[in-house]
Amino acid sequence: MQPRTLLTVALLALLASARAEEVEGSLLLGSVQGYMEQASKTVQDALSSVQESDIAVVARGWMDNHFRFLKGYWSKFTDKFTGFWDSNPEDQPTPAIES
């Protein structure tokens, strides 16, 4: 064999080997990417369920506090008007007029 032919065959063998490793590498990379996408989706689902429950707890606390405030405000409001209606002049005795 001539040196050029031997060099060309060796170069082609190296290129074929590199190409095979590249294909294997891309297959490995693809499987790792698929695994990472699946893992990130699982983590996102878990975090969203935790966030939903945290949001529900915060919303429940907010609603409880504001309803308690509204109930207190309403009772003060009704007490004032109840007191207003209770102090009707007809119910109160008239003072004696001294002459």
UniProtKB/Swiss-Prot annotation:
Pfam families: Apo-CIII (PF05778). It comes from the Eukaryota. The record marks 41 as: May interact with the LDL receptor. The keyword Heme does not apply. Glycans are attached at residue 94. The modification Methionine sulfoxide is found at residue 63. The most abundant glycoforms are characterized by an O-linked disaccharide galactose linked to N-acetylgalactosamine (Gal-GalNAc), further modified with up to 3 sialic acid residues. Less abundant glycoforms are characterized by more complex and fucosylated glycan moieties. O-glycosylated on Thr-94 with a core 1 or possibly core 8 glycan. GO terms for molecular function: lipid binding. Residues 1-20 form the signal peptide. Keywords: Chylomicron, Glycoprotein, Lipid degradation, Lipid metabolism, Lipid transport, Oxidation, Secreted, Sialic acid, Signal, Transport, VLDL. Residues 68-99 are annotated as: Lipid-binding. It is found in: Secreted. InterPro entries: Apo-CIII, Apo_CIII_sf. Disulfide bonds: none annotated. GO terms for cellular component: chylomicron; cytosol; extracellular region; very-low-density lipoprotein particle. The keyword Transferase does not apply. Its main location: secreted. PANTHER family: APOLIPOPROTEIN C-III. Component of triglyceride-rich very low density lipoproteins (VLDL) and high density lipoproteins (HDL) in plasma. Plays a multifaceted role in triglyceride homeostasis. Intracellularly, promotes hepatic very low density lipoprotein 1 (VLDL1) assembly and secretion; extracellularly, attenuates hydrolysis and clearance of triglyceride-rich lipoproteins (TRLs). Impairs the lipolysis of TRLs by inhibiting lipoprotein lipase and the hepatic uptake of TRLs by remnant receptors. This is Apolipoprotein C-III. The lineage of its organism: Eukaryota, Metazoa, Chordata, Craniata, Vertebrata.
